[in-house]
Amino acid sequence: MFDNLSDKLDKAFHILKGHGKITDVNVADTLKEVRRALLDADVNFKIAKDFTTRVRDKAIGENVLTTLQPGQLMVKIVKDELTELMGGETAGVNLSGNPTVILMSGLQGSGKTTFSGKLANYLKTKKNKKPLLVACDIYRPAAINQLHVVGGQIGVEVYSEEGNRNPVEIAQNAIKHAKANGFNVVIVDTAGRLAVDEEMMNEIANVHKAIQPQETLFVVDSMTGQDAVNTAKAFNDRLNFDGVVLTKLDGDTRGGAAITIKSVVDKPIKFVGTGEKMEAIDVFHPSRMAERILGMGDVVSLVERAQEQYDEEEARKLQKKIAKNEFGFDDFLTQIQQVKKMGNMKDLVGMIPGAGKALKDVEIEDDAFKHIEAIIYSMTPGERSKPTVLDAKRKNRIAKGSGTSVQQVNQLLKQFDQMSKMMKMMQGGAGKNLMRMMGGMKGMQG
């Protein structure tokens, strides 16, 4: 995520390395590279220019008051200014109303229908809501089918009316259905277009007027950069939406849309999509995003994701197994599956401070655990619980059954052995304290 921008900003800050203090000259040299990095990231020229002017003024002004090294001071100021540029504070979704009505809008291909499903899943699993998805795209039967498939995946009902060509009527009927059947959130997925046009604007304006949603979200593909920003501006001028959703952020190496959209439309980014899975949705935190752009990672989000997968009862069972030296491949597999639920691997690595930079040339596949799972699934229950029985003949059978090599099987056994030893060591105070801390923090979240 934003790898190109992160690299270029890092090189810009390098100019100040070895300098004892900030001067007009070294600030100008650094900010010239910062501005170039922002322009390469598809940030609007005026926004990039204004941004570097604010950073320069702060750097010169704060220099006499700080004990920070010039490079550290510049990183701090750029982080603070990036945070402000992207909205400053985290903006939550408005869940007032009974039911809460959320109107989804956006261009065709922006990921609007998929995100509608992700939002429904988020509200169901994280906010304890009972959402209803509504199919109002009367032009593309495939969009209605897609929403039904998405609803089936997450266990959320989808309301649609076959043969009805009036999206206003469909939306109004869906809200009546929601009230009659105990749904407390209605997510209305509207028709997308290939470009912003008058017909599309009129239609969604009519739907908006008829159902008076508590929240209107505009979904944009972050990988389209300035096009996304321009589209959002044209749409907001007509509809005056409440917030922006940036999809496909995991594939965006530049970051122009995320950085500039708030200052152009003066509406907050509320959510981001970071993968194809229904769980790949994050509330947008400007300060955390600024830290990730600057290669500082995002430990808070990483811990939050880990806590969501943390099961105190399972942790106790695992602790007992480790104490009795009964940790087996079934337990190892459970740990892998919990990590997978946290999100795609590249995104997780990017949350670890310094890891994104250190591993920038390493290809991190989303199915990084595929071979490990195949090897474990090719073992018998007895072999999984007692790996010491695995001789050459058994390893050969497992390799053939999993489509891997004996070398890969041996490599996994070595990793498993190392992990078992590490977990045994963690049975001491440090490990128990860590488990207690995770449980305590999860309790604090409620």
Model features per residue range: what roles?
Residues F2-H19, R288-G446:
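Long amphipathic alpha-helical segments used for membrane anchoring, targeting, substrate engagement
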Residues L9-C136, A143-N164, I170-T190:
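Primarily NTPase-proximal linker/entry elements flanking Walker-type ATP/GTP-binding cores
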Residues L16, D42, V78, L107, ...:
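Residue-level signature of catalytic and energy-coupling elements of molecular machines
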Residues D40, D57-I60, T83, G87, ...:
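Generic secondary-structure signature for well-ordered alpha-helical cores
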Residues G109-S110, Y139-P141, R165-P167, G192-V196, ...:
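Short, small-residue-enriched loops and turns at beta-alpha junctions
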Residues K126-L132, I154-V158, N184-V186, I211-T216, ...:
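Short, surface-exposed connector motifs at secondary-structure boundaries
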Residues A171-I175, K179, F183, A195, ...:
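Conserved phosphate-handling catalytic cores of large alpha/beta enzymes
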